[in-house]
């Protein structure tokens, strides 16, 4: 079974995502659904476990529909030895407010919450526990552990963690936005990407010269080839004030001619291109990359020594 590091302890949404990815047979070399979860204390620690060989893969959150992308994940992917994305899954996220058995809402003075979770239930807490004192937790499951061990009165946590620690629920299905979702990635050391499925995503990190028009020129490599971008985001390079790297996700696979040509052009144009992978999403996008054009087919036939196979465009 594949050792997969994740933000622990047992009972986090990340563990649920890990189990879903494994059950779907999306772990390279382990399509039997088997996985050995390896809980760690943070998302960067999960990725470092892959880099050091302590785990074969890591399952980490990358973005949620409430607060957007998660900076610790982005930074850990861009800095350090290269890693690659092999699969993803998206979970509907709703929280439970839990206490020890016999504790009522009127008894709650302190509440533990993972900061990402606290941001997604802020309105509920204001309405139902306006005077509660918030205590930080390093994960949703850690918040539940703090309640079970008597460190706080209540926690914002996952149903999985609540069941694991045998806690009592004050409220279930708590979330300020009813369509809250979080996307998770399966990440390993670089290797051959999963085969093209037609519903794929490709991601890169671009470092470009700090000159006028440089970003526009880089993005034009996608636009001129009809490639749809699904995300573009900047993060500091940490090498100097005002210097940034750019995370770009696009529809398509490195096996698509248009995507491959864009990546080659970016490699020539940018100071650095870090390829984060091409992987199946299971989602159909309207802007699929265009198929190989007639000129590309003609060139491939020349390489194969078959110039007569293509009649060329009509005169």
UniProtKB/Swiss-Prot annotation:
Domain Prephenate dehydratase: 3-189
Entry-linked Gene3D superfamilies: 3.30.70.260, Periplasmic binding protein-like II (3.40.190.10)
Pathway in which the depicted protein is active: Amino-acid biosynthesis; L-phenylalanine biosynthesis; phenylpyruvate from prephenate: step 1/1
Keywords carried by this UniProt record: Amino-acid biosynthesis, Aromatic amino acid biosynthesis, Lyase, Phenylalanine biosynthesis
UniProt key word Amino-acid biosynthesis: yes
EC number in record: 4.2.1.51
PANTHER family listed in its UniProt record: PREPHENATE DEHYDRATASE P PROTEIN, PREPHENATE DEHYDRATASE-RELATED
Protein name (Swiss-Prot/TrEMBL): Prephenate dehydratase
Source lineage: Bacteria, Bacillati, Actinomycetota, Actinomycetes, Mycobacteriales
């Amino acid at each position: 079974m594949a050792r997969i590091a994740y933000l622990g302890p047992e009972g986090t949404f990340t563990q649920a995502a890990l189990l879903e990815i494994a059950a779907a047979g999306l772990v390279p070399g382990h399509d039997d659904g088997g996985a050995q979860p390896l809980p760690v204390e943070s998302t960067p620690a999960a990725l470092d476990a892959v880099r050091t060989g302590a785990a074969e893969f890591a399952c980490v959150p990358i973005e949620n529909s409430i607060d957007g992308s998660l900076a610790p994940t982005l930074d850990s992917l861009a800095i350090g030895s290269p890693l690659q994305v092999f699969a993803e899954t998206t979970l509907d996220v709703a929280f439970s407010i839990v206490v020890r058995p016999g504790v009522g809402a009127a008894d709650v003075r302190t509440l533990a919450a993972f900061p990402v979770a606290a941001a997604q239930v802020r309105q509920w807490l204001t309405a139902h526990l306006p005077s509660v004192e918030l205590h930080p937790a390093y994960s949703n499951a850690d918040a539940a552990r703090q309640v079970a061990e008597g460190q706080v009165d209540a926690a914002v946590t996952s149903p999985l963690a609540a069941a694991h620690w045998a806690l009592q629920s004050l409220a279930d299905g708590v979330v300020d936005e009813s369509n809250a979702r979080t996307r998770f990635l399966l990440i390993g050391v670089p290797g051959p990407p999963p085969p093209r499925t037609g519903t794929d995503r490709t991601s890169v990190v671009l470092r470009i010269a700090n000159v006028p028009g440089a970003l526009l020129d880089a993005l034009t490599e996608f636009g001129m080839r009809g490639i749809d971008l699904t995300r573009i985001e900047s993060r500091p390079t940490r090498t100097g004030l005002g210097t940034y790297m750019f995370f770009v996700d696009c529809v398509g696979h490195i096996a698509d001619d248009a995507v491959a040509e864009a990546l080659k052009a970016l490699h020539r144009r940018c100071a650095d291109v870090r390829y984060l992978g091409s992987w199946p999403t299971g989602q159909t996008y309207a802007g699929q990359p265009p198929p190989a054009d007639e000129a590309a087919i003609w060139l491939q036939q020349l390489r194969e020594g078959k110039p007569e196979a293509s009649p060329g465009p009509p005169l």
